[in-house]
Amino acid sequence: MEKFVCDVCGYIYDPVVGDPDNGVAPGTKFKDIPDTWVCPLCKLDKTHFSKVE
């Protein structure tokens, strides 16, 4: 699965792990995360993330 990085703070969203502390279950693809989700470190929305190449 593809990882995504926050362009501002460097947080990496790993779909294998998810973000269970913020309601995103392990195995959730980035595109399937609700638009209301924000980066757990800097609190910016999904538009500030880029795919890790």
Curated annotation (Swiss-Prot):
Summarize where Fe cation binds, as residue positions: 6, 9, 39, 42
**Cofactor stoichiometry and binding remark:** Binds 1 Fe(3+) ion per subunit.
Q: List the disulfide bonds.
A: none
| Rubredoxin-like domain sequence ranges | 1-53
Gene3D superfamilies hit by this protein = 2.20.28.10
What are the protein's UniProt keywords? Electron transport, Iron, Metal-binding, Transport
What Pfam families does this protein map onto? Rubredoxin (PF00301)
Cofactors (names): Fe(3+)
Q: Which InterPro entries match?
A: Rubredoxin (IPR024922), Rubredoxin-like_dom (IPR024934), Rubredoxin_dom (IPR024935), Rubredoxin_ET (IPR050526)
By its UniProt entry, which CDD domains does this protein fall under?
A: rubredoxin
PANTHER family for the chain? RUBREDOXIN, RUBREDOXIN-1-RELATED
Q: Function of this protein?
A: Rubredoxin is a small nonheme, iron protein lacking acid-labile sulfide. Its single Fe, chelated to 4 Cys, functions as an electron acceptor and may also stabilize the conformation of the molecule.
Report the NCBIfam families cross-referenced here: RubredRD
Q: What is this protein called?
A: Rubredoxin-1
Organism (species): Clostridium perfringens (strain 13 / Type A)
Q: Which gene encodes it?
A: rubR1
